[in-house]
Swiss-Prot record:
Protein name per its UniProtKB record: Large ribosomal subunit protein bL9
Cellular component per GO, a single term: ribonucleoprotein complex
Lineage: Bacteria, Pseudomonadati, Pseudomonadota, Betaproteobacteria, Burkholderiales
UniProt cross-references to SUPFAM superfamilies, sorted A to Z: L9 N-domain-like, Ribosomal protein L9 C-domain
Entry keywords, A to Z: Ribonucleoprotein, Ribosomal protein, RNA-binding, rRNA-binding
UniProt-listed InterPro entries: Ribosomal_bL9, Ribosomal_bL9/RNase_H1_N, Ribosomal_bL9_bac/chp, Ribosomal_bL9_C, Ribosomal_bL9_C_sf, Ribosomal_bL9_N, Ribosomal_bL9_N_sf
GO BP, sorted A to Z: translation
Pfam families the record matches: Ribosomal_L9_C, Ribosomal_L9_N
HAMAP family: Ribosomal_bL9
Amino acid sequence: MQVILLEKVVNLGNLGEIVKVKDGYARNFLIPQRKARRATTAAVAEFEVKRAELEKIAAEKLAASQAQGEKLTGQTVQISQKSGVDGRLFGSVTNADIAVALTKQGFAVEKAQVRMPTGPLKVTGDHTVAVALHTDVVIEVTITIVGEHA
């Protein structure tokens, strides 16, 4: 299926590009998330009319994400979990836990924005995770896990 991208999509393209994607990806993700529209002749014509407005909205989102990124850069989040004597946690710290901790500190971060390529954190100490506020704005945050001995 051919779609027009309404915003920048990682590993796919930028705003306004017409790309060919699998039907399921378009129907189940891109179109419901309002990241793309079907590339019909009417939709292409309508997009060209609204292009400047969409580019302005995309620039505003990028500026807001960059401003939030500047505030969030260098932040340290402290999370306490029950742990054993050797420093291993009973359970783990996931991206949802980190998003909740950042939200408590006053940063609007969703769990999908927290990138943990090595998986959940299972050991006490300092860890660095990436937070993708925008496709172009990815910052690093230090997570300090403090063990509560059971």
